[in-house]
Amino acid sequence: MSYMAKKCGVRFQPPAIILVYEDKEAGKSRQRIMPIRNFSKYSDCSRAAEQLKNNPRHKDYLDLVSLRQLEKLYKLLKGHLKGESLKVTLEEIKKEETIDPEEDLNKLDDKELAKRKHVMDELFEKNRKKKDDPDFEYEIEVDFTKDEQAESCGWDDASDEGF
């Protein structure tokens, strides 16, 4: 059977992941409600998302839904279970997905560092120019002219006397 995922969302009460999909064989739009059991505010969102995606009962339906999107939905549910507002939870998710250029990555633990590297890799792949892109150029030549006078540094001037 082939299914085309259209929308994916979360229901807070009772907790469930809701998928709106199109059944390609029948040509009809349908809705699938996948209940979330044994999930608390202390649960690991990435692990729960993996378990749902690999569940044989839902696997065919969630094939086109990314694991990252399922993790976000679980984080929204986790924030709701903690008593946080939707706005606060969305801000936390956005903060996790953006890279602060001033942040010292040496101070992060291994798990957080792996998350940051994953976000950077995704951002790199998104912005990377591929051969098939219309504005792709194979060789870019840059001319560094020597018309401008090179600026000298203060420490260069002091060491010139010794030579």
From Swiss-Prot:
GO cellular component: centriole; ciliary basal body; cytoplasm; spindle pole
Transmembrane segments: none
One of the GO biological process terms: cilium assembly
Keyword tags: Cell projection, Cilium, Cilium biogenesis/degradation, Cytoplasm, Cytoskeleton
Cellular compartment(s): Cytoplasm, Cytoskeleton, Microtubule organizing center, Centrosome, Centriole; Cytoplasm, Cytoskeleton, Spindle pole; Cytoplasm, Cytoskeleton, Cilium basal body
Endoplasmic reticulum in keyword set: no
Taxonomy, superkingdom: Eukaryota
InterPro entries, per database record: CEP19 (IPR029412)
Protein role: Required for ciliation. Recruits the RABL2B GTPase to the ciliary base to initiate ciliation.
Family: Belongs to the CEP19 family.
Protein name: Centrosomal protein of 19 kDa
Gene name of the encoded protein: cep19
